[in-house]
Amino acid sequence: MKIRGFELVSSFTDENLLPKRETAHAAGYDLKVAVRTVVAPGEIVLVPTGVKAYMQPTEVLYLYDRSSNPRKKCLVLINSVGVIDGDYYGNPGNEGHIFAQMKNITDQEVVLEVGERIVQAVFATFLIADGDAADGVRTGGFGSTGH
């Protein structure tokens, strides 16, 4: 039985894209760029990682910016923290493909090459408030839970 982890989405085959932790005490798994991406000055782009994540019903995957991105790549994760819900995995809209929403904070073009580490992903548990009666079902992919 699978508990939590990462898989490639069907349109990618390079297993080097599968996230891993770099050190024994690291909380985050490094997600990589799956498609060469050019980010124009000031532009916000969705950077494909080529992976999806599965987890338990009371877990979430948080995406955090790498601390070196602003300094070394002049990029920031524009939504500060990405939230990947468990029901995003395998959705009919995009299989659960995880994207990093990055902004170029310079007046220069930034090029992201395949295999570059772009964000960190951290699994965590979450709590439900008393009286919560959420019973909706995800019907789409990226950004689809809003009304």
Give the residues covered by each predicted segment:
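DUTPase catalytic domain/fold
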Residues: 1-147
